[in-house]
Amino acid sequence: MLRTFQRTLTKCQTPSLAIRKQCFRRQFANARSTKYMGRSGSSLRYGPWLTASALIATSLCFYDGTVQNDEKNDGSLPYNESVQVDSSVSDFPLTITALNFPVSTNFKLLGYGQRHVTFLRFKVYALGLYLAVNDEDLIANTFNEAYLHKYFLDVDDSKTFKQNLARFLKRDDPKSVMMIDDLLDSGMRMLAKITPVRNTDFKHLKEGLVKTISKHPDVANNKETLENGLEELNKAFSRNGSVRKNDDLIIELLANGALQFSYHDNKNNEFEVMGLVNNQLVGKFLFSQYLSGDKSPSPQAKKTAIDKLITLM
C-alpha cells in the first residue's frame, strides 16, 4: 500500500496537476480516522486503512480526469490560499469547496471582519462571507442601469455606473437594504463562516443569529411568517454544549432560500450537518443584515463584502 501511495504521489507531482496535488495532499493529511456527519442524526467513521484505500482511488480519479460535481470545477480556485481575519484563530480560506467542507458548491471569499460586543468592548467571533462562484452573474443581472434609474431619483449622470452603485449600497438606508434583498431574491447562494475567538456554546451562537435576524427592518411586516421560521431555526439548531475557540459554524444559503447549518470541530477535523431551515425569510434576513443596513453584526465584513461585490460587476 505504501508503494501504491508513492506511485500515486509521483503522478500527482506533474505541474499540470497542481490543483489536484493540493487536494490529494490535504486529503492524505486527514487520513486518520475521522467523522463526517452526512445528514442530521447520522455519522460515519472510517478506519485509517479504509480511508487510505479511498484516497488512492480518489488520487487516481484526479489523475485520470476531473471530478464531476453539480457545478463546473473552476481550476483557478486558490484552494491553499487564506487570509487572516483575527490573529487568535486560524486563517480563513479564500475558497470553500465540497472537497473540504459539507457544502453544495464552490464558494469564494467576498468579505470578512470581526463581531464586537460594543458595550463590553471585546471580540466575539471572526466572520467570513462567501459567494457561490457560479452565481457572480446574478449581481450584474440584478444591478444594472435600468434598475438604478427605476428605484433612485438621485442617480448622478456625471459618475460611472459602479460609482453610483457603490454610493447607493453604502448609504445604510432602507433602499440599500432593498437592493441587497433584491439580490438575495435572485437565488444567489452565499455562505457565512463564523469562528469564535473565545470559548462559547451553541446557545449563545443561536441567540446571536436570532438577534441579527430580528433587527431586519421588514420584521414588523412579516411577523407571523418569521416567527414560524425562527421556530424552525430553533429545531435545526438543537445541539447543546460548548463550542471551542477556533471551531467553525458554517451557514449555507441555498438557491431556494433555505439555510443549511454545519459545525466544524477544528481540533479533531470533524464535521456535523446540524439541520436545515426551509423558511426563506430566515436566510434572507440573516444575509441581508450581514450585507446592508446600520445594524450589521460586523460593519467591517459588510464593507469589504460590498467593495468586492462592486468589483465583480
Over which residues does each language-model region extend?
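Short, compositionally biased
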Residues: 262-276
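Extracellular glycan-recognition regions
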Residues: 36-245, 272-313
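N-terminal mitochondrial targeting presequence
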Residues: 1-48
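Short tryptophan-centered beta-strand motifs in secreted/extracellular beta-sheet-rich domains
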Residues: 238, 244-265
